[in-house]
UniProtKB/Swiss-Prot annotation:
Precursors of the cornified envelope of the stratum corneum. It comes from Homo sapiens. Skin-specific. Expression was readily detected in adult trunk skin, adult arm skin, fetal skin, penal skin, vulva, esophagus and tongue. Not expressed in the cervix, rectum, lung, colon, or placenta. InterPro entries: LCE. This is Late cornified envelope protein 2A. Belongs to the LCE cluster present on 1q21.
Length: 106
């Protein structure tokens, strides 16, 4: 009997529960930052062939080194071209691949 009582006394004390974390002071809700303005770009989207205006150098963003022709309405019977007729691709072997002031390829 006394031995069992001694064993109970020798047992480690039960672990204390962790301390409660300090309560955070109430904070004001952070205000949402102002939405970013839409990117200013003179390039059209992929739906229009990715052709850029002369203000951005006349390069075609989707054609890779292409140039913009004069902005006219694409004709419907130009079905054999994959991109908009407003955009022409400069061949890599065709010199510097620059664009004329009119937007045509050099």
């Amino acid at each position: 009997m006394s031995c069992q009582q001694n064993q109970q006394q020798c047992q480690p004390p039960p672990k204390c529960p962790p301390k409660c974390p300090p309560k955070c002071p109430p904070k004001c809700r952070p205000q949402c930052p102002a939405p970013c303005p839409p990117p200013v770009s003179s390039c059209c989207g992929p739906s229009s062939g990715g052709c850029c205006g002369s203000s951005s150098g006349g390069c075609c963003s989707s054609g890779g080194g292409g140039c913009c022709l004069s902005h006219h309405r694409p004709r419907l019977f130009h079905r054999h071209r994959h991109q908009s007729p407003d955009c022409c691709e400069c061949e890599p072997s065709g010199g510097s691949g620059c664009c004329h002031s009119s937007g045509d390829c050099c």
